[in-house]
From Swiss-Prot:
Belongs to the dihydroorotate dehydrogenase family. Type 2 subfamily. It comes from Cupriavidus pinatubonensis (strain JMP 134 / LMG 1197) (Cupriavidus necator (strain JMP 134)). FMN binds at residues 65-69, 89, 145, 178, 223, 251, 274, 303, 324-325. This is Dihydroorotate dehydrogenase (quinone). It is an enzyme of class 1 (oxidoreductase). Pathway: Pyrimidine metabolism; UMP biosynthesis via de novo pathway; orotate from (S)-dihydroorotate (quinone route): step 1/1. Catalyzes the conversion of dihydroorotate to orotate with quinone as electron acceptor. The keyword Glycosyltransferase does not apply. Its EC number is 1.3.5.2. It comes from the Bacteria. Binds 1 FMN per subunit.
Amino acid sequence: MLNALYPLFRPALFSMDAEDAHHFTLNNLLRAQRLGLGGCIGNRIAEDPRTVMGVRFPNPVGLAAGLDKDGAYIDGLASFGFGFIEVGTVTPRAQPGNPRPRMFRLPQADALINRMGFNNGGVDAFIANVKASRWKAEGGVLGLNIGKNADTPIERAADDYLYCLERVYPHASYVTVNISSPNTKNLRQLQGASELDSLLSTLKAAQQRLADQHKRYVPVALKIAPDLDADQIGNIGDALVRHKIDGVIATNTTISRDAVKGLPHAEEAGGLSGRPVFEQSTHVVRALRQVVGDAVPIIGVGGIFSGADARAKIDAGAKLVQVYSGLIYRGPTLVRDCAAALRA
């Protein structure tokens, strides 16, 4: 039902502040789910299982992190038929993020700019929400995305990632280490060769220790930026293989404005997502695949607005895909279209 109605609702939603519309939609989606209306508003998607990172995904279309930062809306979002859902980014301590307004639509370009700044309620509240999810309890594949607090010095970033990893590990299908948001000062420095080598070494050791402790191996993936040159992609790919990291998510938002110059809000600070990042993010997927081969599976995200876009990510070397901005513009029909295009 929502597939048909979303185009009618969208003008009203787009008349609201972008962040207010975001919360309004999620709250009403969760309310409908709790009233037992999830089957009426969502998608029924046939299973098309893929095993990636040792995890069985019911279908290859997932929700990217950022839409549900606190894991508070998992059950409502699950009604869209995702093969997996990623929530976060979460940090050790609660933080408000950047001042509002901090999210902007560029409808002429099917794009968003955000400078949210990892606003979240902290990892303990996050875990409580995850544990309360019925969908997760019934076997839903849930990725938990972790980051560092804004006031943690970059030299101590590993402490924040370790703190979060230890707490989310028992509750995750996989864990994503976000080092690529442009909205936390100096965070992307962690993509540098020496910084990344040190961080991955630390996290891999912790993962092995936690696997022994919990008698369960939870894969760890790294989320990277699209704003990388060939040498940087090569260095990151080599580090992923060398440290036996389980997966990589390519990509986060871009700081480039080349594709949206002159549009309202184009010069707002933050990360640009949506259709304009498609080519750039797909290039990173393709280049990264040439470096890592089959050793490190890639989850492709960035600018997916159609089944053909999802197929292009897979053809470039991704094993799974994620959507976010396309969902805002197209609604849950996008999930159905992508799943159909990728059906084996």
